[in-house]
């Protein structure tokens, strides 16, 4: 009956640890609770359980129910109650809402991350399935095929415009399908982007409870009694003490000694014995090994190693020191017929003398990484701007284009060809503005560097022609003609190495203004930086190979009294009164005011072909016909600072850029190589030379490629003229 009474007072909603019933879950029958004492009422523990599960609002009804139950138990303690009495004794069941509020499901928040995973490939990289049509396997072991991705960018754009959920659609890497994020997931992403916590209910700034405060408490935090072992001596500590006592007795542990304040001086060489074995082995230098025998020492050497009768007689007549071999090679039919070596004892004796008398030296081997020997050069893309591609092609000449020159402003381009014409081009459009027929092969052309003078000098045959191109500003063209017409000839004519002649009216209509006639063909013409002096090179053998003409006074002079070889080209120094003269094997720098030789540069080339001076004036480059480009640093040495062998054939022309740290070279291999040449103001830092681009475009004609190169005065552009009759602009 006690069990029955207990059953009457227990309800499924009020049992401790009972799972809360779900709406679609059937209730289970609860086993009766057995009490140990039939005469006693509910225990304290049961009361505490009921008091914890029931709310305060139902205390009165519960007490009444308990009294009725107790009365029923006391009245009939030995008999069983009928079903009607049981129904009256059982308390009413609480509502579903009250049961849910009182009891909480302990598995409510339990979840598994792998319940919703359809791809069961495991923890393997999905990149393994890149080459397969499927992306994994489902729970049944069937393949999960990748969705067809046939949508292009236009479809994606239409989805982006039409689909309102496009911004919250992501791709599942496990299955390859598109997933739509819920509002909770979007809110979670927004919180994480703002640096907040993922749980919206988490308060990081909730008030802290200072459990262990500074106030002295009356009672301890934990009232656990002390262990029994705390009153007994520790066996572990006893073993440690025993081991320490034994170590002290054995002398393993020694007490600390006070430090000795007296300094100690040691004799570094007191312990060394020169006769000791270790001392001898330290300084031992192994003897050099004997050279291995060669083919000549074989008993059956090849026929070319056997000396002839003349060589044998010559060997016998030589002194022993002069002989290359101290024996004569002999041939024997077999090894058993080889006699004993007659000089064996002598050679052993000489070997012993060498080991005894000749000193030995230990050579320290230095291990050098080959990568450290290669200079660390910057990347070409870090050295921009420089020309990288072909921009324009100037077509019009019918033969070799030997020379070209750019106007000081960079708007016009002049070119000379073997077809006897001088053409003037517009740089921006590649349009031929003017064609002047001079009646001869133009070997060199130079535009006056003075921006206030519109004048071009061209060398053809044995004359230098000065012409006014009449392009650009009309005031500039008129002032140039007026400057040439204001010349008054001297009263007493002087003997000059060249003749200045006025052109005819027909030639004047074509643009020609003056003609300077020489005794030999002219190979080069170049202007001084101010535009008043003109230097020419003649193909003669005497001291008149180089002439200097003055435009304002129409005078010519020969600066040298004797010749130092065949002159190839000349150039004026940009800042100093120097004249640079390049011969076949050397470059000489002359001081024009002092009339003396300043420096002589040795390029170590077979034949110098061209030369250019850096705008700062402290560096020079020269090209040669043996495929070398030589860089000279005048402040460093008279020998080359660096030799570049990038071209495969002869170099025809070299040039510096007036503003940018660039220089270029043209060769017969049809290529133009542009290099970065940075010159620093710090004299302790060497120039930086880095090849940055190889420009190709000219076709080889008569085994000739690029004949001349020139830079644009303001832009990082380079012009090249070739044997194919074209001029190309690279930008």
UniProtKB/Swiss-Prot annotation:
Q: Region entry Disordered: which residue ranges? A: 1-116
Q: Which residues carry this modification: Phosphotyrosine?
A: 107
Question: Source organism's superkingdom?
Answer: Eukaryota
Positions of the WD repeats?
396-435, 437-477, 517-559, 562-600, 603-642, 646-685, 701-731
Q: Name one GO biological process term.
A: ribosomal large subunit assembly
The terms under GO molecular function for this entry are: ribonucleoprotein complex binding
Q: For the region Sufficient for nucleolar localization, what residue ranges are annotated?
A: 250-412
SUPFAM superfamilies of this UniProt entry? WD40 repeat-like (SSF50978)
| Bias type Basic residues, positions | 1-10
A GO cellular component annotation here is: PeBoW complex
First-listed, main subcellular location of the protein, grouped into a coarse class? nucleus
Coiled-coil annotation reads: none
Q: Key word Phosphoprotein present in the record?
A: yes
Q: Name positions with the PTM Phosphoserine.
A: 111-112
Write out the annotated subcellular location: Nucleus, Nucleolus; Nucleus, Nucleoplasm
Q: Is the keyword Repeat in the record? A: yes
* Compositional bias segments (type: Acidic residues): 56-66, 106-116
This protein's assembly is summarised as:
Component of the PeBoW complex, composed of BOP1, PES1 and WDR12. The complex is held together by BOP1, which interacts with PES1 via its N-terminal domain and with WDR12 via a high-affinity interaction between the seven-bladed beta-propeller domains of the 2 proteins. The NOP7 complex associates with the 66S pre-ribosome. The PeBoW complex associates with DDX27, BOP1 interacts directly with DDX27.
| Name under which the protein is recorded | Ribosome biogenesis protein BOP1
